Amino acid sequence: GTLGGNVAQDARCWYYRGGMPCYRAGGNTCYADTPTSINREHCLFDADRCVAVSPSDTAPALIALDAELVIRNKQGERVVGAEDFFVAPKIDITRMTVLEPGDLLTSIRLPRAWANRAFYFEKASDRQAWDFPLVNVAAAMVVQDGTIQQARIAVGGVAARPLRLKAVESSLIGEKAGKDLADLAGQTAIYGARALDHNPYKIPLLANLVKRSVRSVTG
């Protein structure tokens, strides 16, 4: 696989990829959101007719680092921020990214502002590193004299697109690093989570990964 291929992956849902006529495929049903559905790997946030998740490990890291993605087509070149590259179902349920037919993702730019800054990435999966994530987290911070000056945190495996945790970031900036602050970040991360029938385990998993990211980056 390639970096571009990882970022531009389609939704991870066996009903959708198996050819079921779901909302994302142009139908009028979400087969993953019923009491009998197999949905342990599906979303906790921002479900809008579709509960499939973005399966990319790279995407949260690019969002945390405020990366830019360069896209080319016959008309020329355009640059899109990593956070704006991904499309939520409520905007357009038929696609996961802003890529149009004929578009090619040619490069990814990482801003110098985050060079040599504290960064953390972790994912939880059923098997080894090459498996799809159940939940992943990426965090980038600037810490001076024990106080968090800047923070960007993004997670994957919990929504249809990689999710930037702006409320968590706000709870960290200007605060002294420590266990209590990390605990607060974990609890803030899961506010508003809605578990499906078979994925309630993702809520404490998300809280713990965010908590660990804050402890590791600020430690």
Language-model features: where?
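C-terminal structural segment of proteins
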Residues: 1-219
